[in-house]
Amino acid sequence: MIRRPAMSGIVGFRRPPVPGAAGFPREEFEAVSRASPVIFFICPYGTSISTVRWAIQRLGRDGFHVVAYEAAKAVFMDGDPEILPGLIASVRADIKAQIARLTSEGVTEFGFFGSSLGSFIFYNCVGDAVPELRWGVFNTGGGIARGMWRLDGARRQHVMRGWSLARLEAAWAGVQYPEFGHLDGCRFVFVSSRRDKIAPLDNIEPYLGSMRQAGAQVSVLEVPAIGHFSTIVAGLWRAPRFVAMVRPAVGPAPAR
């Protein structure tokens, strides 16, 4: 097989953006080696891949092949609770398809890094759902309904359509409490801040019990921040360090 020429000193090759399942954009950043470990990366809510390319590039410098996704604001701003479960199912199916393709090309290791909404999507992509994802970073976490309810614009859209927080929590119970199946040997870290008003640190612990019962090693780390956005940015900046912490063959890395 002929190797493509390197297009950047940061990543080996950047494929043009393509629409994934359900129309969400997917962009791929190849490492120099085709057998490099792959990180699936989902952007924060309302954030484009281009906006967080700097974080993807930092992972590329460490030799990772990155497959990045973004989701439209419609997932919350349309005021339709059915969009979120559909988006999760579509992204999960696309990830499985990409894993099958990459495995056929010689890749043997897959992990993830998700921020904000992206973190929650990955919460529904581990265990029996996508068993190849053995390690990953949840950059913020907690209850999705309460987090969305704290977004003024999204809350108004749902209230206008007759939704209350209690009804929304019931509608999203299936994705808030997924059946993980087997997580034996998996390693995950949740990143958050006490000052994050959308997804605060103390909202994470109630959702970790089922992961641990399924066999996963799960830790929670606090980053210095003053709100949700700065929490996300702090986690993205430290992405290489957090990834190194959960990769079994690598162990903790120096602070960056």
Annotate each language-model stretch with its function.
Residues 1-34:
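N-terminal cap/lid segment of alpha/beta-hydrolase-fold proteins
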Residues 25, 32-72:
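Short, surface-exposed "cap/lid" segments of acyl-processing enzymes
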Residues 70-77, 142, 226:
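Short beta-to-alpha linker loops that shape the active-site pocket of alpha/beta-hydrolase fold enzymes
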Residues 81-104:
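Alpha/beta-hydrolase active-site loop
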Residues 100-153:
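Primarily recognizes the serine-hydrolase "nucleophile elbow" in alpha/beta-hydrolase
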Residues 147-150, 155-203:
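The feature captures the conserved acid-bearing segment of alpha/beta-hydrolase catalytic domains
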Residues 197-218:
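Active-site-adjacent alpha-helix of alpha/beta-hydrolase-fold enzymes
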Residues 212-256:
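C-terminal catalytic histidine-bearing segment of alpha/beta-hydrolase fold enzymes
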